[in-house]
């Protein structure tokens, strides 16, 4: 087997090529015995042309990847040039000679940095939270939204200790429970749910907080949901609901009466949600709720994604609006639900790659009202994911540990955050060591 | 997060054991590599409770409650990562989602805590992880918390360090000294003194640049047999190689002969392809393979255990050799052999299952260069103390269509 060398060129080789061109043209000019003045003029012209072509503008050129950028209608082979933190140019055949570093992505898909709107990354907070960077950026996620790990009492600590230090763009749904996601004691206590305090916190940090979260509330009344709805309304932000139906507190009422258009119900393929009837038919109220603008989010986690629910629902056309992980200390082990895993499940169930990318870029961006994200724009921030769709035999576990065997697997090979290659699984952007010389004292 | 309900439901559906089912889990048909017992063959591994019950050529499936078909996979003792960062140091990682998912069931935190902070380390990490966590305690009382603390020779007390080690002899397996940025050898001498007082090995990370007025030879002289040099394939730590001839230095070989051990400690800055390639070419493999995995290296070099092993496979090490240097050898270093690092019958059932993929794969080193290799080891399943903790290919579970109206299918 031959080993393919890294396809990386740099401006030195480009410059050398141009020098060669200049020499050749000088030589040709000499042998044709052109007048001296003409020779000089030609040489000057050639030098000028070389200088223009060699003006290095791009820090990085992502070459020949299959770009899927739903928002801008891009779906095909294209180059993306990056300068500093931003996308300088997107188009066909951008000149490699203008780039400091060229990466050949012929085998890969290139998408906007993925967005995971249901995560638990307040790592200095409650036990189940994870490190914000390595369970996001390694899977192409450049924007993660923490879903209510902290409430108004703990948010500023979360911001100072984690959000402001993370390399991933970390946003938050603020828990309506002041203490945050710290167990039944506080999460079932309406006295913890101070609407005014939550609203004030959302308004104080509009760059970080995208909305309100309510979750895990067990008493059979509407206190938690209604207060969260009110807080979201008063702060003009998004609401995400995790809901356990009870006698006298039904799911249909939640999505048709209590929640407002634009609110998100997460965990909707979970067992606690009566989304299917006894014959596995999608309930009418699901369609009605979707029509009135309720959004349905996956939020896979340890308990909320079941093939026996998702497969029939998807066959009937009830797809998720947004694909997210609910990633935390348990779900990352078994069933190993990081975003590439969850995306791969939907791909193998039958969604197209475009549908999967739409639900991990544009749709979540709209859901959290950050329409500047999830897209690739000239002049926009260079948050980019490079994905490989592997072919073979792959297995995926759901929350009940039922297994789906599929033939496709999405694997993130490269992630750019603010123009910087922060994850490069196989060194695509790096020069080959064996040609790099004896690089002693590399620092 | 409906995890709580899921947890409650585990155990509701219990596979009723038929008569004669003596084992809880049977790993069937995998290629077992167990250097401690000189096994390198297709074998079945049976587990009862948290122990290895039997390793044999053919154990009938009906003797087990749960059979995992491991045909085509490689089965090894759970790997032991001698150099990890899971406490104290700013780039520390949670070991379960970084190590158990990559085949390491035991990690040794390399100097994150000192005698002042070990109790906190124990309460917040060691007692709460599913990964087995040991400590190389830092000779610095405050631990690896930045240069001000790490250069404070007044906080390097061999006596207090040894006293803490005597308090937790089952958890603290040695002493670390690292990042000492003053002239001379004080940190090393204190660490070795603590090692002498506690009768435990010392692991050393110490630069040799002239600014610190240190030489590799003198460092080797202070070290005792059984002590370890980590970051061996860096080019600013140990002078394994002569830089002009690119051959192994005679004094390095002498040190090995004396019993000084050479650990990988890959990390962010301490593994350079040309150094490793030349050292391997001149027959100087590491004694122990370890990662120095932290929040930086997990991005730059991706150097978890299977990644580091794959790099050595490319430079000519055999897989059984690499497994030995990741199981029985580190177990001996921390004096936990034969409890750990073996699939011996009656030993704890810490087991890793790997796939050895063939193809073309890119790997990266500290200076961010790329190596193209044709083999890649990848962790697919991990068992820790008899319990399945990671199963990427769902080997232990049925297909969802055949599971009926399944409740949570119990984790074996």
Spans of features found by a protein language model:
Chain B
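Divalent-metal coordination cores built from histidine and acidic residues
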Residues: 70, 96-179
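Di-metal (Zn2+ and/or Mg2+/Mn2+) metal-binding site signature of metallo-dependent hydrolases
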Residues: 73-96
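Bacterial N-terminal signal peptides that target proteins for export
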Residues: 1-7
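Active-site core of metal-dependent hydrolases
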Residues: 174-278, 282-299
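C-terminal cap of metal-dependent C-N hydrolases
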Residues: 30, 348-402
């Amino acid at each position: 087997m031959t080993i393919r060398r890294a396809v990386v060129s740099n401006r030195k080789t480009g410059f050398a090529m141009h020098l060669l061109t200049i020499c050749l043209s000088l030589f040709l000019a000499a042998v044709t015995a052109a007048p001296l003045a003409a020779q000089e003029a030609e040489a000057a012209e050639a030098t000028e042309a070389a200088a223009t072509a060699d003006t290095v503008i791009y820090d990085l050129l992502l070459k020949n990847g299959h770009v899927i950028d739903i928002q801008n209608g891009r779906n095909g082979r294209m180059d993306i040039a990056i300068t500093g933190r931003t996308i300088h140019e997107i188009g066909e055949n951008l000149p490699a000679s203008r780039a400091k570093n060229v990466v050949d992505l012929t085998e890969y898909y290139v998408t906007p940095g993925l967005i995971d709107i249901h995560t638990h990354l307040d790592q200095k907070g409650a036990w189940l939270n994870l490190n914000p960077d390595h369970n996001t950026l390694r899977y192409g996620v450049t924007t993660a939204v923490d879903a209510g790990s902290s409430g108004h009492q703990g948010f500023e600590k979360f911001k100072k200790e984690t959000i402001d230090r993370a390399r991933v763009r970390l946003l938050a749904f603020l828990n309506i429970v002041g203490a945050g996601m710290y167990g039944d004691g506080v999460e079932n206590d309406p006295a913890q749910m101070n609407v005014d305090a939550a609203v004030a916190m959302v308004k104080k940090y509009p760059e970080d907080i995208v909305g309100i979260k309510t979750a895990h509330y067990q008493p059979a009344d509407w206190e938690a949901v209604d207060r969260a709805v009110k807080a979201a309304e008063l702060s003009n932000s998004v609401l995400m609901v995790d809901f356990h139906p009870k006698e006298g507190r039904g799911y249909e009422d939640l999505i048709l009466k209590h929640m407002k258009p634009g609110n998100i119900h997460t965990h909707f393929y979970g067992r606690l949600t009566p989304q299917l009837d006894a014959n596995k038919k999608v309930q009418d109220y699901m369609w009605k709720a979707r029509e009135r603008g309720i959004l349905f989010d996956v939020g896979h986690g340890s308990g909320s994604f079941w093939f026996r629910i998702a497969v029939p629902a998807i066959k009937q056309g009830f797809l998720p609006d947004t694909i997210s992980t609910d990633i935390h200390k348990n779900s990352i082990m078994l069933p190993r639900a990081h975003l590439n895993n969850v995306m791969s499940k939907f791909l193998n169930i039958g969604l197209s790659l475009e549908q999967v990318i739409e639900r991990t870029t544009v749709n979540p961006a709209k859901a959290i009202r950050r329409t500047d994200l999830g897209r690739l724009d000239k002049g926009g921030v260079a948050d980019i994911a490079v994905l490989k769709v592997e072919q073979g035999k792959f297995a995926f576990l759901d929350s009940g540990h039922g297994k789906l065997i599929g033939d496709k697997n999405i694997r993130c090979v490269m992630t750019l955050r603010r123009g910087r290659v922060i994850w490069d699984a196989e060194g695509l952007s790096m020069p080959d060591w064996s040609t790099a010389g004896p690089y002693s004292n590399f620092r | 997060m409906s995890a709580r309900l899921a947890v409650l439901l585990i155990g509701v559906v219990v596979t009723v054991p038929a008569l004669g089912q003596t084992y809880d889990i049977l790993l069937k048909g995998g290629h077992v590599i167990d250097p401690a017992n000189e096994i390198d063959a297709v074998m079945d591994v049976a587990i009862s409770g948290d122990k290895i019950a039997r390793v044999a050529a053919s154990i009938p499936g009906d003797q087990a409650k749960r059979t995992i078909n491991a045909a085509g996979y490689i089965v090894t003792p759970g790997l032991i990562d001698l150099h990890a960062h899971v406490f104290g140091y700013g780039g520390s990682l949670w070991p379960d989602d970084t190590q158990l998912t990559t085949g390491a069931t035991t990690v040794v935190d390399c100097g994150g805590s000192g005698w002042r902070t070990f109790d906190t380390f124990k309460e917040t990490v060691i007692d709460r992880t599913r990964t087995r966590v040991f400590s190389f305690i830092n000779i610095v009382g405050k631990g690896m918390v930045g240069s001000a603390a790490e250069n404070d020779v007044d906080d390097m007390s061999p006596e207090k360090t040894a006293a803490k080690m005597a308090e937790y002899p089952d958890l603290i397996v040695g002493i670390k000294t690292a990042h000492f940025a003053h002239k001379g050898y004080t940190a090393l001498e204190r660490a070795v003194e603590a090692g002498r007082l506690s009768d435990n090995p010392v692991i050393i990370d110490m630069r040799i640049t002239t600014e610190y007025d240190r030489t590799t030879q003198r460092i080797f002289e202070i070290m005792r047999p059984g002590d370890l040099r980590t970051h061996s394939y860096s080019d600013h730590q140990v002078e394994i190689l002569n830089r002009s001839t690119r051959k192994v230095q005679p004094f390095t070989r002498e040190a090995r002969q004396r019993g000084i051990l050479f650990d990988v400690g890959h990390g962010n800055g301490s593994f350079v392809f040309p150094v490793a390639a030349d050292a391997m070419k001149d027959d100087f493999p590491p004694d122990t393979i370890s990662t120095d995995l932290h929040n930086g290296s997990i991005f730059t070099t991706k150097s978890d255990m299977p990644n580091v092993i794959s790099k050595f496979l490319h430079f000519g090490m055999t897989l059984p050799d690499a497994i030995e240097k990741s199981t029985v050898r580190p177990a001996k270093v921390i004096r936990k052999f034969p409890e750990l690092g073996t699939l011996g019958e009656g030993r704890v059932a810490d087991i890793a299952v790997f796939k050895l993929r063939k193809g073309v794969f890119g790997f990266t080193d500290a200076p961010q260069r790329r190596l193209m290799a044709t083999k890649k080891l990848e962790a697919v399943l991990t068992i820790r103390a008899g319990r399945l903790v990671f199963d990427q290919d769902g080997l232990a579970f049925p297909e969802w269509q055949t599971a009926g109206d399944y409740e949570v299918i119990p984790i074996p």
